[in-house]
Amino acid sequence: MKNASTVSEDTASNQEPTLHRGLHNRHIQLIALGGAIGTGLFLGIGPAIQMAGPAVLLGYGVAGIIAFLIMRQLGEMVVEEPVSGSFAHFAYKYWGPFAGFLSGWNYWVMFVLVGMAELTAAGIYMQYWFPDVPTWIWAAAFFIIINAVNLVNVRLYGETEFWFALIKVLAIIGMIGFGLWLLFSGHGGEKASIDNLWRYGGFFATGWNGLILSLAVIMFSFGGLELIGITAAEARDPEKSIPKAVNQVVYRILLFYIGSLVVLLALYPWVEVKSNSSPFVMIFHNLDSNVVASALNFVILVASLSVYNSGVYSNSRMLFGLSVQGNAPKFLTRVSRRGVPINSLMLSGAITSLVVLINYLLPQKAFGLLMALVVATLLLNWIMICLAHLRFRAAMRRQGRETQFKALLYPFGNYLCIAFLGMILLLMCTMDDMRLSAILLPVWIVFLFMAFKTLRRK
């Protein structure tokens, strides 16, 4: 099997279609923001608040630090080798064929599940306006629209995601500003007060146990940041754009998440936040700001579609990279004249379309089930990034090479992140809603190992 960079060169020399470097720095930053700011913030935050109370703010801070360390590790590798397949390429090259096979297919499955979760959430948001229309109809409609956009070319995808993400970012800034105005102008109602952060049982209202358990749900909110690595093969000037994206994206995510949460928890008592709807829409609806609530619901809908849009992009590129490595069927390397990995895109879409059936059969449980499965696969992906980076740095040291964009706290940071992610996985085993996904993870790894061995024998 050839590595990704070698095959890319061979393909180019034969003048066959390859992935186009059509993404600028602004695209990359907002693609990563678009992949992370979505249902995890607007819908998934409800269960986290119920578990941790106001201390959920601390939970997001801790998870954000871990996410930043891992993204710096990924960023260091990507700047040195900006190839298709991202961390699956590095796992393959520096750990071995099975590590690349495991990383790539696990990431692909994760973003298929993310896509299903976001389409499910989009259907839930649409029920705010059309309560009688089932979620599966909306999931099917948005599935068709987003995949059609991605079939055109990477530049159109980048522009679409840029505007999707920009709408989200501006809306979050506006929501924080409007919330602060409501809070300090007296227009936020009788319940609005900064005292809400400690009035109902204190800041650690559910104790340290509640805070620690909430981390399993909080991790869902940070999934998608690794899209920075996926964009590398189509980034213009990756040596400059990737470091900027890595450094700025995590800061902005933390600002948006923690800023939004402070406003949310101050405007409304955390004990009244529900887990089955968007807390943000609920608060403005209860404040009789129906116009604002509808506008915010529209933004939240865009947020979900944005994350799914990012997932369609990343999944097709990951499959392309797997095929280049020899870890997926060769027909998936086919690239259209416009630079779109067409067969990879179509296969990913075909599997994601099962979300329509899931929402039809399990309309009330679909989102919770999908979120738990996403968290389990996300933990494995990030652990593989940390492990691949350890081998990458060892290889650089043997070659006497100095990297341009160094990860922080190496190697202690790698082991810290692995221990943290392992702790989250153990916590999931104690939670009724997440236990199944944690148990299925080792089964999934064994299945992939057997599939890998079978393919190698053939």
UniProtKB/Swiss-Prot annotation:
<feature type="topological domain" description="Cytoplasmic">
    <location>
        <begin position="72"/>
        <end position="105"/>
    </location>
</feature>
<feature type="topological domain" description="Periplasmic">
    <location>
        <begin position="49"/>
        <end position="50"/>
    </location>
</feature>
<feature type="transmembrane region" description="Helical; Name=XI">
    <location>
        <begin position="412"/>
        <end position="432"/>
    </location>
</feature>
<feature type="topological domain" description="Cytoplasmic">
    <location>
        <begin position="218"/>
        <end position="250"/>
    </location>
</feature>
<comment type="function">
    <text>Permease that is involved in the active transport across the cytoplasmic membrane of phenylalanine. Can also transport tyrosine, but not tryptophan.</text>
</comment>
<dbReference type="InterPro" id="IPR004841">
    <property type="entry name" value="AA-permease/SLC12A_dom"/>
</dbReference>
<feature type="topological domain" description="Cytoplasmic">
    <location>
        <begin position="456"/>
        <end position="458"/>
    </location>
</feature>
<protein>
    <recommendedName>
        <fullName>Phenylalanine-specific permease</fullName>
    </recommendedName>
</protein>
<feature type="transmembrane region" description="Helical; Name=XII">
    <location>
        <begin position="435"/>
        <end position="455"/>
    </location>
</feature>
<feature type="topological domain" description="Periplasmic">
    <location>
        <begin position="363"/>
        <end position="367"/>
    </location>
</feature>
<comment type="similarity">
    <text>Belongs to the amino acid-polyamine-organocation (APC) superfamily. Amino acid transporter (AAT) (TC 2.A.3.1) family.</text>
</comment>
<feature type="topological domain" description="Periplasmic">
    <location>
        <begin position="433"/>
        <end position="434"/>
    </location>
</feature>
<dbReference type="GO" id="GO:0055085">
    <property type="term" value="P:transmembrane transport"/>
</dbReference>
<dbReference type="InterPro" id="IPR004840">
    <property type="entry name" value="Amino_acid_permease_CS"/>
</dbReference>
<keyword id="KW-0997">Cell inner membrane</keyword>
<keyword id="KW-0813">Transport</keyword>
<feature type="topological domain" description="Cytoplasmic">
    <location>
        <begin position="154"/>
        <end position="160"/>
    </location>
</feature>
<feature type="topological domain" description="Periplasmic">
    <location>
        <begin position="127"/>
        <end position="132"/>
    </location>
</feature>
<feature type="transmembrane region" description="Helical; Name=VII">
    <location>
        <begin position="251"/>
        <end position="271"/>
    </location>
</feature>
<dbReference type="GO" id="GO:0015823">
    <property type="term" value="P:phenylalanine transport"/>
</dbReference>
<keyword id="KW-0812">Transmembrane</keyword>
<keyword id="KW-0472">Membrane</keyword>
<keyword id="KW-1133">Transmembrane helix</keyword>
<feature type="transmembrane region" description="Helical; Name=X">
    <location>
        <begin position="368"/>
        <end position="388"/>
    </location>
</feature>
<feature type="topological domain" description="Cytoplasmic">
    <location>
        <begin position="1"/>
        <end position="27"/>
    </location>
</feature>
<feature type="topological domain" description="Periplasmic">
    <location>
        <begin position="272"/>
        <end position="288"/>
    </location>
</feature>
<feature type="topological domain" description="Periplasmic">
    <location>
        <begin position="182"/>
        <end position="196"/>
    </location>
</feature>
<feature type="transmembrane region" description="Helical; Name=V">
    <location>
        <begin position="161"/>
        <end position="181"/>
    </location>
</feature>
<feature type="transmembrane region" description="Helical; Name=VI">
    <location>
        <begin position="197"/>
        <end position="217"/>
    </location>
</feature>
<feature type="transmembrane region" description="Helical; Name=II">
    <location>
        <begin position="51"/>
        <end position="71"/>
    </location>
</feature>
<feature type="transmembrane region" description="Helical; Name=I">
    <location>
        <begin position="28"/>
        <end position="48"/>
    </location>
</feature>
<dbReference type="Pfam" id="PF00324">
    <property type="entry name" value="AA_permease"/>
</dbReference>
<feature type="transmembrane region" description="Helical; Name=IV">
    <location>
        <begin position="133"/>
        <end position="153"/>
    </location>
</feature>
<dbReference type="GO" id="GO:0006865">
    <property type="term" value="P:amino acid transport"/>
</dbReference>
<feature type="topological domain" description="Cytoplasmic">
    <location>
        <begin position="389"/>
        <end position="411"/>
    </location>
</feature>
<feature type="transmembrane region" description="Helical; Name=VIII">
    <location>
        <begin position="289"/>
        <end position="309"/>
    </location>
</feature>
<feature type="transmembrane region" description="Helical; Name=IX">
    <location>
        <begin position="342"/>
        <end position="362"/>
    </location>
</feature>
<keyword id="KW-0029">Amino-acid transport</keyword>
<keyword id="KW-1003">Cell membrane</keyword>
<feature type="topological domain" description="Cytoplasmic">
    <location>
        <begin position="310"/>
        <end position="341"/>
    </location>
</feature>
<dbReference type="GO" id="GO:0005886">
    <property type="term" value="C:plasma membrane"/>
</dbReference>
<feature type="transmembrane region" description="Helical; Name=III">
    <location>
        <begin position="106"/>
        <end position="126"/>
    </location>
</feature>
